[in-house]
UniProtKB/Swiss-Prot annotation:
Residues 43-62, 191-212 are annotated as: Disordered. The keyword Hydrolase does not apply. The keyword Secreted applies. One of its GO terms (biological process) is response to xenobiotic stimulus. SMART domains: WAP. Vascular smooth muscle and prostate. Periacinar ring. Keywords: Disulfide bond, Protease inhibitor, Secreted, Serine protease inhibitor, Signal. Residues 51-100 form the WAP domain. It comes from Rattus norvegicus. Residues 1-26 form the signal peptide. InterPro entries: Elafin-like_sf, WAP_dom, WFDC1. This is WAP four-disulfide core domain protein 1. Disulfide bonds join 58-88, 70-92, 75-87, 81-96. It is found in: Secreted.
Amino acid sequence: MGSCDRKALWALSFLLLLLGSSSVQGTWEAMLPVRLAEKSQAEEVAATGSRQPHADRCPPPPRTLPPGACQATRCQSDSECPRHRRCCYNGCAYACLEAVPPPPVLDWLVQPKPRWLGGNGWLLDGPEEVLQAEACSTTEDGAEPLLCPSGYECHILQPGDAAQGIPNHGRCVKQRRQAEGRVLRQKLHKEYPEGDSKYVAEPGKGQQRHFP
């Protein structure tokens, strides 16, 4: 093969190579806008995904179609609604409705502690059963006795000695119903095991009742 034929073959190969590269580049340039459009659409969906209607803040769907429900202004996400409204289903379409407040959360750190009544029974009591730092006395020595506030009774811890002028001393505990007296006595005996008996004063009275 002569040198002219070789040059012609090289020129033809180079021309085909240029045509192929330009075709590939043209195809990529033609596909680039489509790729960018798909990417931007995916980013938009990801960005608006968190603004979709929150079903947990929506009122339950009505059983009957409310008047004007189908004529209400429609929405697609909560961001299209005012502050206190959510994009919810109104029975016909999604529209901005009043948001439902979240359910209450029980904080068991501050909730009343359960009290065992025996068997399978439990009773929720107040946050504090003993009035903190509240001393009391039922001894009448010419002055008014140091009684407890309403709803509490004086649980005598130290009987005192009336002959020597020593008043009794106790703490204010919350009153119980008569049916709970046995449980209360057992609990107080565990908390204050001074001796085999306890003295509990009636509220507003000077005398004491002795529980064996």
